[in-house]
């Protein structure tokens, strides 16, 4: 099993190209199920989750081709021949449930395995199902599968989400694009990835109003056509490498990064002492003086994203003073804390909050990655630590970060990925 070795203490300097956003690419790939025509996607990241979605789309009969040597341009096209999304694929990635809405809207039926670890009623997947039921779908749960059917077309509906779930907004937005009548999604998620999906759907012929707001109005059409669409830059990758520049006292140009997508991340980092300068080619991130503790609470966009919580906590672990990090989106998302404490951090968890008392220096240690964002947080800690850090179980990284060791090494980090 691969691991990453880091010898810390080297300020980063150079440029890192920010890739396409995984969380935008996955739902946009699902749009390939909404038309027989060809959908061409540019700036697609090369990640394990993209490969999983590719396999799932192909399972339904849609051909997915890579049009360039690096695989960043995908072509999707063909007729749906199968409406079942099997457990063997869906278990690998929660976002696999995004095929439910398109399959149901297009074919009138879908059988999709419940995503791994999903408990109906306590996880956001129930919002997908209730919204589709309001649009006329009949849904049953049996043997770990969602069975959904509708007579004729889905019908437009006025849907109020109990919370601004990103996945539910995406699924219902795609389904409503082919529904009969007008659908209003209230308390919809507002993330840039939702905007990107809406723009792709509009380029395919969908009629959507309210993009970027909490209320989306979708006038369903009978058919969508092919299009070409470019995936937006990954704001979480941007924030992660901004933390890398700050924690090492370095200076990085993050090419293609967009300040308008960072929202609360940029504001919070600046308040903590990180300098972020917008340039034509991206964002220049540096730190000239010390960091100081700033409290943060994760919230739906435009609030501070839960996917940046672990990385920010590492930054606070070497900041002057104390800070409180409160997680409101997901339960049990502090699994990186014991590993950071092994490296000398002083973090105490109290329910949904973690109290972080900054230390002057972290120490290298063998640590275990527990999930995607925790993996990157441990790498950040290793970059700042004195001595050698070994991060185990780094396969999590491949789901959301492309060539991390290579990108950081090119900017002066002493880091390598070790196989076996």
Curated annotation (Swiss-Prot):
Organism ancestry: Bacteria, Pseudomonadati, Pseudomonadota, Alphaproteobacteria, Acetobacterales
> Where are the 2-(S-cysteinyl)pyruvic acid O-phosphothioketal modifications?
118
Q: Which CDD domains match?
A: UdpNAET (cd01555)
| One Gene Ontology MF term | UDP-N-acetylglucosamine 1-carboxyvinyltransferase activity
Swiss-Prot/TrEMBL keywords: Cell cycle, Cell division, Cell shape, Cell wall biogenesis/degradation, Cytoplasm, Peptidoglycan synthesis, Pyruvate, Transferase
Q: Which residues bind phosphoenolpyruvate?
A: 22-23
- Name of the gene encoding the protein in the UniProt record: murA
- According to its UniProt record, which protein family does this protein belong to? Belongs to the EPSP synthase family. MurA subfamily.
**Reaction(s) this enzyme catalyzes, per UniProt:** phosphoenolpyruvate + UDP-N-acetyl-alpha-D-glucosamine = UDP-N-acetyl-3-O-(1-carboxyvinyl)-alpha-D-glucosamine + phosphate
Disulphide linkage map = none
Q: In which pathway does it act?
A: Cell wall biogenesis; peptidoglycan biosynthesis
Q: What is this protein called?
A: UDP-N-acetylglucosamine 1-carboxyvinyltransferase
GO annotations of cellular component type: cytoplasm
Q: List the catalytic residues.
A: 118
Q: EC number(s) in its UniProt entry?
A: 2.5.1.7
GO terms, biological process: cell division; cell wall organization; peptidoglycan biosynthetic process; regulation of cell shape; UDP-N-acetylgalactosamine biosynthetic process
Its domain of life?
A: Bacteria
């Amino acid at each position: 099993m691969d691991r990453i070795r880091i010898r810390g203490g080297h300020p980063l300097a150079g440029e890192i190209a920010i890739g396409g956003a995984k969380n935008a690419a996955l739902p946009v790939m699902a749009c390939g199920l909404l038309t027989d025509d060809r959908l061409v996607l540019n700036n697609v990241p090369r990640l394990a989750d993209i490969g999983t979605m590719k396999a799932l789309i192909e399972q339904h009969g849609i051909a997915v081709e890579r049009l360039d040597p690096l695989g960043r341009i995908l072509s999707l096209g063909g007729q749906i021949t199968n409406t079942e999304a099997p457990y063997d694929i869906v278990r690998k990635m929660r976002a696999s449930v995004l095929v439910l809405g398109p399959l149901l809207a297009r074919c009138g039926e879908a059988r999709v395995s419940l995503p791994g670890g999903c408990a109906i009623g306590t996880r956001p997947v129930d919002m997908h199902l209730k919204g589709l039921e309001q649009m006329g779908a009949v849904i049953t749960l049996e043997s770990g599968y969602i069975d959904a059917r509708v007579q004729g077309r889905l019908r437009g509906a006025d849907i109020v989400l109990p919370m601004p779930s990103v996945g539910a907004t995406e699924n219902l937005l795609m389904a409503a694009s082919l529904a009969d009548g007008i659908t209003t999604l209230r308390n919809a998620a507002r993330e840039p990835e939702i905007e990107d999906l809406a723009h792709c759907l509009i380029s395919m012929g969908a009629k959507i109003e309210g993009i970027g707001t909490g209320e989306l109005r979708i006038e369903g059409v009978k058919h969508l056509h092919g299009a070409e669409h470019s995936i937006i830059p990954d704001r979480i990758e941007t924030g992660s490498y901004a933390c890398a520049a700050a924690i090492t006292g370095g200076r990085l140009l993050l090419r293609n990064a967009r300040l308008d997508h960072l929202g609360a991340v940029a504001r919070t980092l600046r308040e903590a002492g990180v300098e972020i300068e917008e340039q034509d080619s991206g964002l220049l991130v540096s730190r000239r003086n010390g960091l100081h503790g700033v409290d943060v609470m994760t919230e739906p966009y435009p609030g501070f994203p839960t996917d940046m919580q672990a990385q920010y906590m590492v930054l606070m672990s070497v900041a002057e003073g104390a800070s409180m990090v409160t997680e409101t989106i997901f339960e049990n998302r502090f699994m990186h804390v014991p590993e950071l404490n092994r490296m000398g951090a002083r973090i105490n968890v109290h329910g949904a909050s973690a109290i972080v008392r900054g230390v002057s220096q972290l120490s290298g240690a063998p640590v275990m990655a527990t999930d995607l964002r925790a993996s990157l947080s441990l790498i950040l800690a290793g970059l700042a630590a004195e001595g050698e850090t070994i991060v185990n179980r780094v396969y999590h990284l491949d789901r959301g970060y492309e060539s991390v060791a290579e990108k950081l090494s090119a900017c002066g980090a002493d880091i390598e990925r070790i196989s076996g």
